[in-house]
């Protein structure tokens, strides 16, 4: 079920999220250069990513099982398949040039099957962009070892898969994709090591989230967004960052 407060929060932070959406879409558009292009967002929620894609002249479709989120997206003019990804794959006849998914792969029973299905849904040379939490990373290890914290990122029953940069790339390779770019998001664990203990403290959690947003918005508004992207690309190579984002291309079978 979708929490209305979550939608409200995303609305309020929309200018920030649009920067991250543009980053992703620009990377995808380096490969997908044709005029008439179509993108699928798996678990699109209220459709904010697809709104941004639409502004960039993409034809868009979102898959979303939550009726509330699906209706919200439809009201914003986004085409929605209100179903699970599995059900969608059984009946869908369309092909896509790109597939985006954020915070989906860690919840599914069979991530390999999802990647195989995505391969089938894409046109040749199509692009996939997956974002997942970066768990059991070196900073988290330092936090548990040095600050004596529990493994706070383990979240059953919601999260049943845990990924590193390497394991996510390997998963995609096994399904016939060739990863071509990776980046991470700000390593929120830095804040724990700075002394801001946001674990189980929503007030501090909110504060550090705002700090991270401010940093990225300042870089963007001063024409330094590429500095951020290069930094996050480097973080990804080193295996740090709260989330990891992998871009991969469907190669001919």
What is each stretch, according to the model?
Residues 180-213:
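Conserved catalytic loop of SAM-dependent methyltransferase domains
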Residues 130-161, 166-173, 196-197:
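Short, glycine-/aromatic-enriched active-site segment of Class I SAM-dependent methyltransferases
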Residues 125, 136-138, 186-188:
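Feature marks short, surface-exposed loop/turn motifs that line or immediately flank catalytic pockets
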Residues 60, 128-130:
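Hydrophobic/aromatic residues located in beta-strands of well-ordered beta-sheets
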Residues 112-127:
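A short glycine-rich, Lys/Arg-flanked "PGG" loop and its adjoining helix->strand segment in the class I
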Residues 102-109, 131:
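Short catalytic micro-motifs in class I SAM-dependent methyltransferases
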Residues 1-102, 111-115, 184, 209-220, ...:
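Conserved N-terminal segment of class I S-adenosyl-L-methionine
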């Amino acid at each position: 079920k979708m929490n209305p407060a979550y939608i409200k929060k995303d609305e309020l932070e929309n200018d920030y999220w649009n920067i991250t959406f543009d980053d992703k879409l620009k990377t995808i558009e380096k490969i997908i250069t044709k005029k008439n292009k179509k993108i699928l967002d798996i678990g699109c929620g209220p459709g904010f990513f697809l709104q941004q894609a639409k502004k960039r002249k993409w034809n868009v479709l979102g898959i979303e099982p939550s009726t509330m989120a699906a209706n919200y997206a439809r009201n914003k003019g986004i085409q929605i398949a209100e179903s699970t990804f599995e059900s969608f794959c059984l009946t869908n006849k369309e092909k896509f040039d790109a597939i985006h998914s954020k915070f989906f792969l860690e919840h599914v029973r069979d991530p390999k099957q999802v990647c195989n299905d995505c391969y089938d849904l894409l046109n040749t040379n199509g692009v996939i962009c997956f974002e997942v939490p970066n768990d059991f990373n070196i900073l988290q290890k330092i936090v548990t070892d040095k600050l004596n914290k529990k493994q706070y990122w383990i979240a059953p029953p919601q999260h049943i898969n845990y990924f590193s940069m390497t394991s996510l790339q390997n998963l995609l390779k096994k399904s016939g994709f060739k990863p071509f770019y990776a980046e991470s998001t700000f390593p929120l664990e830095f804040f724990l090591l700075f002394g801001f203990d946001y674990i189980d403290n929503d007030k501090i959690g909110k504060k550090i989230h705002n700090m991270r947003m401010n940093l990225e918005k300042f870089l963007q508004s001063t024409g330094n967004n590429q500095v951020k992207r290069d930094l996050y690309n480097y973080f990804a190579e080193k295996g740090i960052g709260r989330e990891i984002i992998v871009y991969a291309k469907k190669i001919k079978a």
